Amino acid sequence: MFLKTPNWETVNETPKSRVLTINELISPNLDTESNSLLATPARKYFKTSISEAQDSPTSAPSPDGNEDPTYQYNVQFHFPGPITPTTPRSKNAEMFPSPTPPLVSPTAVIEEENDDSVREFSRTLKSRLNCAMVKLSKEHEQVALIPPPPTEKIRKGSYSNKFAAKHRRCHSLDESKKFLSSLEDSSAHAAFLKAISSKHAKSNRVDNVNVSPLRWSSHRRTQSTQENSLQEVVAIDTLLKMSSSD
């Protein structure tokens, strides 16, 4: 009949007292051997286990040769050794002694030929870029070493329009001469030159220079009369133009 190992927490260590175990409560009609086995205290079980270890061939014999009967081997209390627990890791180690290869998805698989071609293309691209950078640096150095072309300075003549020359960016003397000749041909430029070189403006400049304080009043009168005459002339000109336009 199969018997379960007694629960040592429920068994009392004193040999005189007898405690009912779970097996006795479940099936009280057990034989005497099973009752004695279940009611055995824990101290006696430990003594028999020590005697079993001494009787084993690996253990050294006692020096006296006389063994205590309490420590003799008892077949009733022989239990097998502990079973090593099996975990998924140990099972995998037993079933697969060699290391498992890394998992690779089929879409991520790349052929070796493609790898070689990509590497070669990247190397050639890098070499081309390096060559282009070297060429550009050499060209910049050559441009910096070349001296600028000589430019002729424009000599000032009787009249030179600096603003027009800057706007036109006349780098040579011929271009500046052509530009000035084109300005002289235009009617607006001719009218501007006439206004500058008019006799009336020259006379005013001469009169205004070196005037004594005694002649200030007379100078003011003459200036006012001249302004009035000029206003009359301008008014007459405007009236004539308006009549001609009508």
UniProtKB/Swiss-Prot annotation:
Domain of life: Eukaryota
CC per GO annotation: cytoplasm; nucleus; SBF transcription complex
Main location: cytoplasm
Entry keyword Transcription regulation: no
Region (Disordered): 49-68, 200-229
Keyword list, A-Z: Cytoplasm, Phosphoprotein
Keyword Transmembrane applies: no
GO biological process per UniProt: G1/S transition of mitotic cell cycle; nucleobase-containing compound metabolic process
GO MF term set: RNA polymerase II cis-regulatory region sequence-specific DNA binding; transcription coregulator activity
Phosphoserine carried by residues: 212
Biological role: Weakly suppresses a RAD53 null mutation when overexpressed.
Record text on subunit structure and interactions: Interacts with CLN2.
Name of the protein in question: Protein SRL3
Lineage start: Eukaryota, Fungi, Dikarya, Ascomycota, Saccharomycotina
Gene from which the chain derives: SRL3
